[in-house]
Amino acid sequence: MPPPEATRLSPHRALGLPLVFTLGLVAFGFLDAVRQNPRLLWSILGAAAALVVWNAVLTLSALRTGRTLKLEIVLRKQHYLQACAQASVLLYWGWYWREVYDSAHLIAAQLVFAYAFDMLLGWSRRDTYTLGFGPFPVIFSINLFLWFKPDWFYLQFLMVALGFAVKELIRWDKDGRRAHIFNPSSFPLAVFSLGLILTGKSDLTWGQDIASTQFYLPHMYVTLFLIGLPGQFFFGVTSMTMSAVVTTYVFGLLYFAATGVYFFYDSYIPIAVFLGMHLLFTDPSTSPRTELGRVIFGMLYGLSTVVLYVLLGRAGLPTFYDKLLQVPLLNLSITLIDRLARSSALRALDPAALGPSLVPRRRNLAYMSIWTILFAVMSAVQGVGDSHPGQWLPFWRQACKDERPYACPYLEDVLSSFCGRGSRWACNEGGMLDRVGAVESSAPPTLDDYPIILRGSKGPIVERTPAVLYAVACREGWPDTCGHAPD
């Protein structure tokens, strides 16, 4: 396909385009949801003011030097397919956690800000700007993992700006061409995550709510699996996702065999981590080129998530950062990983040696077939899915009785949470566990307790008839509930 022909524009016409997006950002300030929060309003107006000043300075400079600016329109499949996948997750997630829908205008505000910022940055450094869907996957990706609460939303604009600045300014030679080093969404996520950790200000964000509410959705694992398939077919990233998932799952199995409890407590792979394995670190532009390198890349992401979970937990820090902090370091390591993958020591392990005559699309299909089989097996044995036993109290009560590592402290935390939601039984159980240090025999939960204590890590139980509650309790392993005839 021939390269797109750029349209030549005068500075006034060219720089009118980012100004239109800036005015679109100002328009969000007229929404009632924004006007009712002065700090949010000033965040939006402040971001717009900075863009207006930059636009004016760039226009005057271009007029003074007689520059002719150019505009290319390139619609890259990588961008719009990824954006469609991310948008699907956002739409499905918002149905079960309304904060996503309530924040739709803020996601849109970030998007128009991103277009204006990217245009101004591009034309500040060169004469040609390429317009396409590029900002969509960056903004959607950031908002799948971290966003600031309205009172601190100016930090969200700074996070977006950092992502586009890093993509433009920090580059290296890759396969004979200049390319960005860092993924423009994962880099600002990592930097701001580190800043929030160091300042102890994680409560300025929805980070913990994001990580937990993404599991409220029914069949979320299979949803992410299906959403990831088009990108895996077209861009050959299956080996990264598959190796990351399998590595983390195998570690979880070994940990359970050694301790009798689950490493991530309520899952083998938390849903937010599973999301990161599909839609965060798999950017083909910032990942290894070799097939073995991509397998190693995925394994390192999975193992680094495990290590970060331990380090953050032992430091008393929020563990939802475990999927975010490592990605820039992995991006920096891709040339080393490719060099290692091409070495004689690992040549025998290179999957590219299998079926060397396969064209890329058929090779992608082969990887996807293997991944589909593995995912089906993991789902069948509750390696992923909605029914992991680590969600349910009966497992942790028995684990605490058996004095398995970390079981009693975790059980106490869960009971405290359920007590805070209104379960008197959980309050009583938690009090006894705190006093005695072990699970004691007590009265069974009542029907008033069941809607609270049966939800596990999922969203609220909607249907609360006695028959349904006893059926759920039986499925979770509560004693004397199977075959119970409610009064």
What is each stretch, according to the model?
Residues 2-123, 381:
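N-terminal signal-anchor module of multipass membrane proteins
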Residues 36-46, 215-219, 241, 263-271, ...:
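Loop-to-transmembrane alpha-helix initiation sites
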Residues 54-71, 114-127, 162-178, 225-235, ...:
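C-terminal ends of transmembrane helices
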Residues 72-81, 128-138, 155-158, 178-189, ...:
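Cytoplasmic-side transmembrane-helix entry/capping segments in multi-pass membrane proteins
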Residues 124-213:
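Membrane-interface helix-loop-helix junctions at boundaries between adjacent transmembrane segments
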Residues 188, 196-249, 253, 257:
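Internal active-site segments that recognize and position negatively charged phosphoryl groups
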Residues 358-384:
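Internal/C-terminal transmembrane anchor helices
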Residues 403-405, 416, 422-424, 430, ...:
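Short helix-capping/linker turns of helical repeat alpha-solenoids
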